[in-house]
Amino acid sequence: MELIMYKNNHFDDVLRIYVDAFTSPPLNYSFVTKQNAGRYITDITMTPCFLGYVFPSEEKISAFVFGKIDNYFDGNLYEVMELAVDPKAQRRGIGTKLMNLLESKLKSLGVDAISLNTSRNLPAFFFYQKNGYTEIKNNVNLAKWL
């Protein structure tokens, strides 16, 4: 299997996967709707330096990863903005295959590192650790609700 660069004709599959993944256990996000997820996905794809891929499995798209490449003084960083695997395809190694293919693809593009954010209390945290990602101890995410 190979990653396929995201194109607009993949939108419906990505939207389906996103809504299914984020409204199913363990997340069960009731605030995720098809409408607001569609706007969110569109916004991400319009981000400067956007680079997204879809992962086909069994004749259909079963996962995607969206991000952007940031060029820093000391190298190029791919920031994962969203990643999801179709809940019907989870626990089959698709996420790990997706990450391995993404890492190879990004290396060939001259990207030096991948960064992402997740919550410590989600299965995704342990998935990323299992795949070699480490917590940056001195970094914190800050927010202020207005």
Language-model regions, residue ranges each:
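Conserved hydrophobic beta-strand within the GNAT/NAT acetyltransferase core sheet
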Residues: 80, 114-118
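Conserved active-site alpha-helix within GNAT-family acetyltransferase domains
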Residues: 96, 108, 112, 120-138, ...
